[in-house]
Design a protein with these regions (language model features):
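Short hydrophobic beta-strand element within catalytic cores of glycosyltransferases
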Residues: 288-292, 302
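Acidic donor-binding loop of glycosyltransferase active sites
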Residues: 259-274, 287
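Active-site donor-binding acidic/aromatic loop of nucleotide-activated sugar
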Residues: 228-231, 242-251, 257, 309-310
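Conserved acidic donor-binding segment of nucleotide-sugar-dependent glycosyltransferases
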Residues: 303-305, 309-316, 325-331
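N-terminal strand-loop element at the rim of the active site
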Residues: 7-16, 21-67
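A conserved mid-protein helix/loop that constitutes part of the nucleotide-sugar donor-binding site
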Residues: 21, 192-215, 227-233, 317-318, ...
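An aromatic- and histidine-rich active-site surface loop
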Residues: 73-75, 86-106, 118
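Donor nucleotide-sugar binding/catalytic pocket of nucleotide-sugar-dependent glycosyltransferases
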Residues: 131-179
């Protein structure tokens, strides 16, 4: 008999984000051997049901948001209708945690804790009790890196039930060699390309990367959207790097940009960047990484001196030095890029992630026999 799994997420693709990519990878691979459904928030004030990636995806009616958390009053009812053996909750997601507790669903609970809840203290006082209650009820909590587990306040009381399962990606779309599209990008922007991808929000640290470009002989392509766009445009002008830095906004197909680039930079400044899926995509494309030494999984994914270079956060000078070292040393850049691709294939593939998650499911199910 197939294991029945219900995923509770914040959103599901085409919404973009690291958690959404992770959820889609699990759903796509698990649906080949399990009965998989997912309940997430919708953009609309009505519920929509779709069949995607081999699974039933229910996007429940959403009535606004509080501190970026969607308000989904009917989610508990939808959870209650599920016959799942395992409920897999993806946090931070206080609304889904509350809905699950309110539903009284009897299934075994597994949580993937992507990051600690961020936000105003007043809202945390409301949300923390039921997030904690969900963790107390959980049979196991998946954490994506040892470093994040060690630094997490929310997980401090639950370390005995935590399991380290790194995120994984489908490496195939990024494994191709240079393409016509990537050649066109290099023709348009130049040969010494630096790429960075992410939402334009404070913890990403993009202002420090822009500042570093004052001392870099190359071109930065910054892909992503967010409310800091105007502020970053001002930063570009103040640093007089208009000819070196291009804000590209949303890009439908990011793979050619990875292939066209010489270096990928993840300049995040806080542990809100828990893992950095985009750096795995860049590594799968065979390019070296410049990342920052923050207390999360970021420097565990791309290791300093092995697959890239790690520098202190909020340090434009160190960023510039690392970028220049890689741009000016073809041999080092190629060696680190090749090692980066191998590391992702060996340790961070979607297949490896799904395999480890299934093993945990089976352990949890065996406990109830």
């Amino acid at each position: 008999m197939k294991i029945r799994v219900l995923h509770l997420g914040k959103y599901y693709p085409p919404h973009t984000g690291g958690i959404e990519i992770y959820l889609q990878q699990l759903v796509t691979h698990q649906s080949k051997g399990m009965d998989v459904t997912a309940i997430v928030a919708n953009d609309l004030r009505r519920t929509q049901v779709e069949f995607l990636d081999g699974a039933k995806i229910t996007r429940v009616a959403t009535f606004g948001a509080i501190a970026s958390m969607p308000i989904t009053p009917t989610m508990a009812w939808h959870i209650r209708q599920s016959k799942a053996d395992i409920v897999h909750l993806h946090t931070p997601n206080p609304g889904a945690a509350l809905a699950l507790l309110a539903s009284g669903h009897p299934g075994k609970l597994i949580i993937t804790h992507h990051a600690d809840t961020l936000g105003r203290k007043q809202l945390r006082r409301i949300s923390d009790p039921f997030v904690r209650a969900a963790m107390e009820r959980a049979s196991a909590i998946i954490v994506t890196s040892k470093r994040y587990l060690e630094s997490s306040e929310e997980l401090a009381s639950f370390r005995d039930k935590c399991r380290i399962i790194p995120l994984g990606i489908d490496t195939a779309p990024f494994a191709n060699l240079k393409t016509t599209e990537s050649a066109y990008i290099r023709t348009e922007y130049g040969e010494r390309l630096i790429l960075s991808v992410g939402r334009l929000v404070p913890y990403k640290g993009f202002e420090y990367l822009i500042q570093s470009m004052k001392n870099v002989d190359g071109t930065l392509l910054l892909v992503g959207t967010g409310y800091l766009q105007r502020e970053l445009q001002r930063c570009i002008q103040e640093c007089s790097v208009q000819d070196k830095v291009h804000l590209l906004g949303h890009v439908d197909d990011i793979a050619p940009y990875y292939r066209a680039s010489s270096i990928f930079v993840l300049p995040s400044i806080t542990r809100a960047e828990a893992f950095g899926v985009v750096q795995m995509e860049a590594m799968a494309s065979g390019i070296p990484i410049v990342n920052t030494d923050i207390p999360s999984g970021v420097p565990e994914v791309s290791v300093h001196g092995q697959t890239g270079l790690t520098v202190p956060p909020e340090d434009p000078v160190a960023l510039a030095q690392a970028i220049n070292l890689l741009l000016d040393n073809d041999t080092l850049r190629q060696q680190l890029g090749a090692a980066a691709r191998k590391r992702v294939q060996d340790e961070f593939s979607a297949e490896k992630m799904v395999e480890r998650t299934l093993k945990l499911y089976e352990e949890v199910m065996a406990e109830s026999v």
